[in-house]
Amino acid sequence: VRGGSGDAVTDIRYVSHKIYDGKPSLPGLPATFAQEGQAQTLEVEAVDAVTGEKATLLYTVFEDYPVITRSVRLENGGEAPVVLERAYSSCVELPTMDLDMVHLWGKWWNENNTERRALQHGITSIQSKRGMTGSNHNPFVAFARPSTTEESGEVWGMNFIYSGNFAIDTEVDT
């Protein structure tokens, strides 16, 4: 977030949270849906006390599926105009570095080719700056133990339902 004075310093801190049944809709965006009894949502509110910028994080768990969905609402609660330059969707720390990264890539009429490779030390990035989802790089990644197959094993998967530009960055350190 870049403020009216040109600064890019934001100090958003936790204010409150609530848990409720169901899943809120995301007007104008593709999304998953759930009724009361099918899911529960954790809503976390954080605010920058100086600028009034507000972030509301929504995490929904589904009763019948091993899925957590996440969305964020950003609001300018201050009086000065701001420009949102970038908003990352999540940061996930996995329990091991001994994982393969699975990514889907392609081209027109040859979409969703699977690429699987071991995570390496350093940073790996899969991204698209086309402003829309396309066949070159699918906004999906999975992290699987090397012994995992299509039928068994542990996998952590993430997918943007609505992406535009996206970056999936991984970093392996010691």
Which residues does each PLM region occupy?
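Polysaccharide-binding surfaces and accessory modules of carbohydrate-active proteins
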Residues: 1-174
